[in-house]
Amino acid sequence: MANTAQARKRARQNTKRRQNSASQRSMVRTYLKRVDAAIAAKDYDAATEAYKKAVPVLDRMADKGILHKNKAARRKSRLNKTIKGLQA
């Protein structure tokens, strides 16, 4: 338990930040699930549209530090590669 005023404040801030981060991570997962669902259905147009909506979200979370920038880049690259495979 936090004993000083400073420690109590930090505990409050950490709780708020943890909740915000969890919400944002959940949002990223939702966007990625939409892309994955379109890929599973082998629907190129839907997958492309979902991917276009997911990319800015991934970039924003990487900028905020919710996701590591390399992880965001890797996810985008793999999704794009999979979508390009649907086109052929």
Swiss-Prot record:
Keyword Zinc-finger: no
Superkingdom of source: Bacteria
GO molecular function, one term: small ribosomal subunit rRNA binding
Biased composition (Basic residues): 7-19
Keyword field: Ribonucleoprotein, Ribosomal protein, RNA-binding, rRNA-binding
One Pfam assignment: Ribosomal_S20p
Listed InterPro entries: Ribosomal_bS20, Ribosomal_bS20_sf
GO CC terms in record: cytosol; small ribosomal subunit
Lyase in keyword set: no
A single BP term in Gene Ontology: translation
Segments for region (Disordered): 1-26
Family from the record: Belongs to the bacterial ribosomal protein bS20 family.
Functional note: Binds directly to 16S ribosomal RNA.
Protein's name in the database: Small ribosomal subunit protein bS20
Lineage: Bacteria, Pseudomonadati, Pseudomonadota, Gammaproteobacteria, Moraxellales
Annotated gene: rpsT
